[in-house]
């Protein structure tokens, strides 16, 4: 669903910021 996709996007952003 949309929230699953949004969660994946947010996770990717947080992962990028963690670098």
From Swiss-Prot:
Tissues in which the protein is found: Expressed by the skin dorsal glands.
Name recorded for this polypeptide: Uperin-2.3
Superkingdom: Eukaryota
DNA repair recorded as keyword: no
Chief localization: secreted
Matches recorded under InterPro entries: Aurein_antimicrobial_peptide
Organism (species): Uperoleia inundata (Floodplain toadlet)
Gene Ontology CC entries for this record: extracellular region
Function comment: Shows a medium antibacterial activity against B.cereus, L.mesenteriodes and S.uberis.
Alphabetically ordered keywords of this record: Amphibian defense peptide, Antibiotic, Antimicrobial, Secreted
GO terms under biological process: defense response to bacterium
Subcellular location per the Swiss-Prot or TrEMBL entry: Secreted
């Amino acid at each position: 669903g949309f929230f699953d996709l949004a969660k994946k996007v947010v996770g990717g952003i947080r992962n990028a910021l963690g670098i």
